């Protein structure tokens, strides 16, 4: 959604992007805006199925990390640590995962806000807030 982040491009999303995932791989990137087009173009450029795979997921626990931190830095000076860590985010990542045997240059880290995350039936994040 608007305000989520794409750390590969070091930008906040300006329009909604919907990833359709089947069998551990993105099969469609839906959205009419520039953000969806950039994601489609970037992943297609690698010509590898692994670029579309789920890499890793997680959720942020750091109450002092800031969602808006990226707005304060030039792209060259920012690697997204705070956005990966801010409390209540859900981090969805695609592409490379050496542990899973997926070697590709295609990779996205997408810290998402407002999600509900369950682990083994227990809610750990509810609507973007730590449970």
Give the ranges of each region predicted by the language model:
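Metal/cofactor-centered catalytic core regions of large enzymes
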Residues: 1-131
